């Protein structure tokens, strides 16, 4: 009997999901992306060689794994082609292992133009999007004017639909934002030029996954971004445009939720956030500099510097609730090496002086709270590359145990470096 495992981020993204997906796919037959787009940045390091994937599932580096892009993903054909070319140059076979849902909404050049124009218009209230058209593409989907991958396979109908949607977006660009219009003919020609190539990879994803489940295959669902960026449950409006939580698996792939066996939440040993938005445990001091420098905290997609802070157990408890986490993978433990003390946020002090252990429902509430910390001794020993609990310094072991106690959730996997080998699995999600 196969296992169906979800791997997702529990914080504001950048938790190290790509590495863990790559590690676990040694036991999986299928890896499925179910939300987001090429705003994701999943970094894999294998034998010292770094690969950054934005759209293609991280299982692509395992020769025996089929990679699926589900209907919940907004797909930029040009970005997909670039990523495929990059992988092929490295000798990674792609076409016979990458499968795509025809129902994926398309990201086209006008989506990117609107995204950039909108961020510019927001001024100092900008959300900090990647500028890759993710939000506008999801807007088109919800408004029922969006174009999907399957539309490309009828050139005449696609041209008509494209003309209509571009009338709307070009009007917004020129009349509201004062930006340049996007050329219709160029957009049409470029999109149709990729139609046959995309068609060769399209399948009925729901049917394929159901057949794989019935055949007893192991399936891994790969989340992008993180729980606190979820459009419904995150620090709204400083969020992404998709459901990054476990509930997004079913809607974004057509896989029945009752068939999910294990949900693994990826959590850094501290917290980071990239872009704008509230961040109660943010450290704008030497310790923050230590975390940012030692952790190489720069966005894999945008290159922007990430904002570091202490581990936020209040936010983590909400992530555990929303996702029904089975277990946690703790990453970047080694980044805490050399600190005299480490802190865990165990509560939020509100303006009236009361302390809560429940997260606010919107960004404004986060901005009003002050973190309440529990302080533990740090450690000077090196944990980089350690692959068993008995090799860790006692202070690091105590930190891990205390996190488990506070969160009431087991830490089943621990990562102590960027390479797939710098990890130890205490409990495997597939066993």
UniProtKB/Swiss-Prot annotation:
GO cellular component: cytoplasm
Entry's localization field: Cytoplasm
Pathway listed: Purine metabolism; AMP biosynthesis via de novo pathway; AMP from IMP: step 1/2
Ligand binding (Mg(2+)): 14, 41
Binding annotation for IMP: 14-17, 39-42, 130, 144, 225, 240, 304
InterPro entries per the UniProt record, alphabetical: Adenylosuccin_syn_GTP-bd, Adenylosuccin_syn_Lys_AS, Adenylosuccinate_synth_dom1, Adenylosuccinate_synth_dom2, Adenylosuccinate_synth_dom3, Adenylosuccinate_synthetase, P-loop_NTPase
Sites where the protein binds GTP: 13-19, 41-43, 306, 332-334, 415-417
Catalytic machinery residues: 14 (proton acceptor), 42 (proton donor)
Molecular function terms, GO-annotated: adenylosuccinate synthase activity; GTP binding; magnesium ion binding
UniProt keywords, alphabetically: Cytoplasm, GTP-binding, Ligase, Magnesium, Metal-binding, Nucleotide-binding, Purine biosynthesis
Binding site for substrate: 300-306
Catalytic reaction equation(s): IMP + L-aspartate + GTP = N(6)-(1,2-dicarboxyethyl)-AMP + GDP + phosphate + 2 H(+)
A biological process term (GO) from this entry: 'de novo' AMP biosynthetic process
Disulfide cross-links: none
Organism superkingdom: Bacteria
Any coiled-coil regions, as ranges: none
Cofactor descriptive note: Binds 1 Mg(2+) ion per subunit.
Cofactor: Mg(2+)
Protein EC: 6.3.4.4
A Pfam family per the record: Adenylsucc_synt
Role played: Plays an important role in the de novo pathway of purine nucleotide biosynthesis. Catalyzes the first committed step in the biosynthesis of AMP from IMP.
NCBIfam families attached to this UniProt entry: PRK01117.1, purA
Binding partners and assembly: Homodimer.
Family to which this protein belongs: Belongs to the adenylosuccinate synthetase family.
Protein known as: Adenylosuccinate synthetase
């Amino acid at each position: 009997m196969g296992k169906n495992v979800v791997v997702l981020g529990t914080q504001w993204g950048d938790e190290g999901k790509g590495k863990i997906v790559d590690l676990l796919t040694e036991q999986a037959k299928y890896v499925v992306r179910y939300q987001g787009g090429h705003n994701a940045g999943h970094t894999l390091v294998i034998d010292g060689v770094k690969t950054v994937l934005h759209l293609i599932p991280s299982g692509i580096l395992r020769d025996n794994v089929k990679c699926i892009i589900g209907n919940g993903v907004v797909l930029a054909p040009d970005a997909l082609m670039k990523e495929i070319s990059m992988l092929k140059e490295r000798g990674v076979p792609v076409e016979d292992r990458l499968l795509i849902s025809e129902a994926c909404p398309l990201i086209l050049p006008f989506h990117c133009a609107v995204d950039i124009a909108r961020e510019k218009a927001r001024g100092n209230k900008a959300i900090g999007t990647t500028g890759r058209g993710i939000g506008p593409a999801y807007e088109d989907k919800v408004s029922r004017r969006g174009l999907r991958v399957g539309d490309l396979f009828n050139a005449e109908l696609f041209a008509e639909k494209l003309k209509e949607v571009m009338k709307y977006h070009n009007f917004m660009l020129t009349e509201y934002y004062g930006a340049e219009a996007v050329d219709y003919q160029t957009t049409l020609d470029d999109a149709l030029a990729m139609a046959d190539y995309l068609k060769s990879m399209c399948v009925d994803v729901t049917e394929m996954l159901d057949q794989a489940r019935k055949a007893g295959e192991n399936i891994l669902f790969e989340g992008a971004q993180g729980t606190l960026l979820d459009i419904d449950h995150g620090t709204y409006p400083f969020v992404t445009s998709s459901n990054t939580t476990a509930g997004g698996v079913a809607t974004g792939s057509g896989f029945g939720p009752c068939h999910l066996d294990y949900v693994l939440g990826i959590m850094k040993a501290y917290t980071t956030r990239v872009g704008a938005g509230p961040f109660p445990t943010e450290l704008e001091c030497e310790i923050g500099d230590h975390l940012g420098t030692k952790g190489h905290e720069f966005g894999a997609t945008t290159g922007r510097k990430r904002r570091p802070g202490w581990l936020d157990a209040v936010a983590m408890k909400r992530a555990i609730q929303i996702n029904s986490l089975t277990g946690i993978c703790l990453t970047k433990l080694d980044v805490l090496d050399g600190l005299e003390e480490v802190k865990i946020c165990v509560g939020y002090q509100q303006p009236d002086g009361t302390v809560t252990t429940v997260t606010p429902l919107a960004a404004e509430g986060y901005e009003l709270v002050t973190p309440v910390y529990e302080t533990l001794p740090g450690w000077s020993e090196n944990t980089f590359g350690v692959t068993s609990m008995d090799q860790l310094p006692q202070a690091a072991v105590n930190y891990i145990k205390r996190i488990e106690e506070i969160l009431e959730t087991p830490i089943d996997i621990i990562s102590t470096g960027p390479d797939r080998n710098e990890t130890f699995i205490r409990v495997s999600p597939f066993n």
